[in-house]
A protein has these predicted regions:
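PAPS-dependent sulfotransferase catalytic domain
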Residues: 1-35
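Short, flexible loop/turn elements at secondary-structure junctions
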Residues: 14-17, 39, 110-112
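PAPS-dependent sulfotransferases, especially Golgi type II membrane carbohydrate sulfotransferases
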Residues: 47-171
Length: 171
């Protein structure tokens, strides 16, 4: 698609989290967007999605990271914490190695409060590839409610256990 259109691509490809470096070398005009969000909000969302999609918090839901066989042996919260850490490790590694002109990192709350600032960044990235992009201005919107602090202690324990028990891929 990129070669056919001769245009840069902006993508959010969760399935590619562990292969972004290879993808960037195949598509040098691709732009990779990383949306950073409060880790506790992310793990709470993933945890709730298990129940929503399967009716059971214990059943795996989402992509299987390279550490899946280790994670699936752990309790549900630790599985979710491990999935989050695996994704973050892969994205950290990728965004360190992919050229800056191909990446955008945006904070979720900042994006919600000022989406037009993100649009300016996106327009600038496209311009760097010789492509003009004009996005309509939009009004800020309210970020989804955070998880609060009630689960923070439980999740911190889950993160600690996973970091001790799971051998994460060293990139």
């Amino acid at each position: 698609m990129q070669a056919e259109l001769s245009l840069p691509i902006v993508m959010k490809g969760m399935i590619m989290n562990w292969n972004l470096i290879q993808l960037s070398s195949l598509m040098p005009n691709a732009i990779f967007l990383r949306l950073k969000r409060n880790p506790f909000d992310v793990v709470n969302s993933l945890y709730k999605a298990r129940s929503t999609h399967s009716g059971d918090y214990e059943k795996w839901w989402s992509f299987k990271p390279p550490e899946f066989e280790q994670l699936v042996q752990l309790p549900a919260r630790e599985q979710v914490a491990g999935l989050f850490l695996s994704i973050e490790n892969a994205l950290d590694r990728a965004f360190e190695q992919i050229p800056n002109n191909q990446t955008i990192t945006v904070d979720y709350v900042d994006f919600c409060r000022n989406p037009n600032e993100f649009f300016k960044t996106l327009e600038h990235k496209f311009h760097g590839f010789g492509c003009e992009l004009e996005l309509n201005q939009v009004k800020p919107f309210k970020p989804s409610a955070g998880s609060g602090s009630e689960n923070t202690t439980r999740w911190n324990k889950a993160f600690d256990l996973v970091q001790k028990e799971v051998e994460f891929i060293k990139y």
